[in-house]
């Protein structure tokens, strides 16, 4: 069973590529979904986040207000490091369990979709890395539209991540997602045929 890390910068199009891969038959494990699960009310990570950042980052139902917390951590590198020290180990535990389960399945490949795959030191959990690439202006345009934030806040979020060109250097495959959805799909299908269908494991 081949486990491939799918990573890329914020708003580069990882979810779009993951949906294409799922249609092709891949099993998808999404680190963003695991991150939400890891900080549900009652979990140790939830308690640690509230202790570190206060109850003002909670919604009325006691779940974490991701936008409020995001405004804090993207503006303050120390706060971001404090948050990551809490969340990364919790996400790692969940992802290791899901990956172990997925390795026992009969899917042709498992893709672990993780924006911080490299930064979180999780690259050793996968057999290969594919990077979804978009240039800075494309990322900014998508991020402001998707999250309803201003350009300044979008730039802060980009600045908090590894530069896209550096991240691309870690991939054995780079999917250029600056063009149309059809162009992206053609690249993904070609990679699937070349890397997965021709090399079943």
Curated annotation (Swiss-Prot):
Coiled coil: none annotated. It catalyses: 3'-dephospho-CoA + ATP = ADP + CoA + H(+). Keywords: ATP-binding, Coenzyme A biosynthesis, Cytoplasm, Kinase, Nucleotide-binding, Transferase. GO terms for biological process: coenzyme A biosynthetic process. InterPro entries: Depp_CoAkinase, P-loop_NTPase. The keyword Oxidoreductase does not apply. CDD domains: DPCK. One of its GO terms (cellular component) is cytoplasm. Its main location: cytoplasm. Residues 3-201 form the DPCK domain. It is found in: Cytoplasm. GO terms for molecular function: ATP binding; dephospho-CoA kinase activity. Gene3D superfamilies: P-loop containing nucleotide triphosphate hydrolases. It comes from the Bacteria. Pathway: Cofactor biosynthesis; coenzyme A biosynthesis; CoA from (R)-pantothenate: step 5/5. ATP binds at residues 11-16. PROSITE patterns: DPCK (PS51219). Its EC number is 2.7.1.24. Belongs to the CoaE family. NCBIfam families: dephospho-CoA kinase. Catalyzes the phosphorylation of the 3'-hydroxyl group of dephosphocoenzyme A to form coenzyme A. This is Dephospho-CoA kinase. It comes from Geobacter metallireducens (strain ATCC 53774 / DSM 7210 / GS-15). The lineage of its organism: Bacteria, Pseudomonadati, Thermodesulfobacteriota, Desulfuromonadia, Geobacterales.
